[in-house]
């Protein structure tokens, strides 16, 4: 069972423009303690948009 202090927790990436949650990924809390922001393709917008970590 995953604990809340997991080193690699699952995170959801949401589009900044349309706010749809399009991607699920893992991140390392030790290397990236802040919220993650990646530019990825949004199928709802049809273009590449910045996606931010949502909780």
UniProtKB/Swiss-Prot annotation:
Gene Ontology molecular function: any one: structural constituent of ribosome
Keyword rRNA processing applies: no
Single GO BP term: translation
Keywords: Ribonucleoprotein, Ribosomal protein
Pfam families found in the cross-reference section: Ribosomal_L33 (PF00471)
Zinc-finger found in the keyword field: no
GO cellular component: cytoplasm; ribonucleoprotein complex; ribosome
Family of the protein in this entry: Belongs to the bacterial ribosomal protein bL33 family.
Database matches in HAMAP family: Ribosomal_bL33
Protein name per UniProt: Large ribosomal subunit protein bL33A
Annotated organism of origin: Mycolicibacterium smegmatis (strain ATCC 700084 / mc(2)155)
Top-level taxonomy: Bacteria, Bacillati, Actinomycetota, Actinomycetes, Mycobacteriales
